[in-house]
Curated annotation (Swiss-Prot):
Subunit structure, interactors included: Homopentamer. In the absence of Mg(2+), interactions between subunits are weakened, and dimers, trimers and tetramers can be observed in vitro.
Gene designation per UniProt: corA
Protein name: Magnesium transport protein CorA
Membrane topology recorded in Swiss-Prot or TrEMBL: Multi-pass membrane protein
Species name: Wigglesworthia glossinidia brevipalpis
Gene3D superfamilies reported for this sequence: CorA soluble domain-like, Magnesium transport protein CorA, transmembrane region
Biological role stated in the UniProt entry: Mediates influx of magnesium ions. Alternates between open and closed states. Activated by low cytoplasmic Mg(2+) levels. Inactive when cytoplasmic Mg(2+) levels are high.
Residues with site note (Essential for ion permeation): N252
UniProtKB keywords: Cell inner membrane, Cell membrane, Ion transport, Magnesium, Membrane, Transmembrane, Transmembrane helix, Transport
Amino acid sequence: MLNAFKLHKKNLFRINIDQSSLIKSIWIDIVNLTEEERRRIQNELGQNLSTSLDLEDIEASARFFEDKEGLHIHSFFFFADAEDHVGNSTVAFIIKNNILYTLRERDLPAFRLYRMRARNQTLKDGNAYEVLLDLFETKIEQLADEIENIYSDLETLSIIIMEGRKSNEYDNALSTLAELEDVGWKVRLCLMDTQRAINFLSKKKHIPYEQLDQAKGILHDIDSLLPHNESLFQKVNFLMQAAMGFINIEQNRIIKIFSVVSVIFLPPTLVASSYGMNFDFMPELKWPLGYPIAILEMILAGLAPYLYFRRKKWL
């Protein structure tokens, strides 16, 4: 799917690609590039786009470079699908002749948000670098929101873990903590990747001075978010250890109960087994009060250790 955007009085608006030419576009946004779209861009704009871009290559030399086809940046963008599966999807950015080309494999929240804002947002300088950096700013805002959401979820989990009384609450909390840790790592990877991309872009001599200041602002935002992201892992680790500790305490309590019960029933069992021995000479067997006395002896044998454990506060 191909979307093209042009400037009108420094306002970004989407054109009808079926009725308008792509010439003078400032942003060409493509989701799952087709051969037909590639040929049209080649014919109208003279830009050669590959239909088989290796978007997932994480080598810096392959993700950030400049050649005759323009300036190339491959950067991660965070997403969460309808089934709450999260991940980072790579977007390829190409800038040439003041046109920004974005090639991606899926719909991304940062792009949707930026398109909505662009309807009423005026570009200060009206160049492709500004659109690129605006997209990165939108991405950083989204990542900041994700960090805030994780903080909120951790606060809820903290209450559940510290006040929980049921084992299934701890099980669910551990599962959620693992998911939050995974989200945190993906956010961190996205932040670090963006930091590398902006550092690469800032070193280019042909980037306008105004966008250089904008890039520095993005780097400052990333530097402020990374420590917050790091503290999330510390919080997750603390809550995991706390949950595991409470689970161990509960398991030890159960084991303790079984141990005490087995000790309490051991003396009565000894008494019962003594009178269950099959010998010819056992005077108590012919005694009329032998059976009730044996039962009473078993009760006292079990009651004595129980009272002792209660006195020691082991129960």
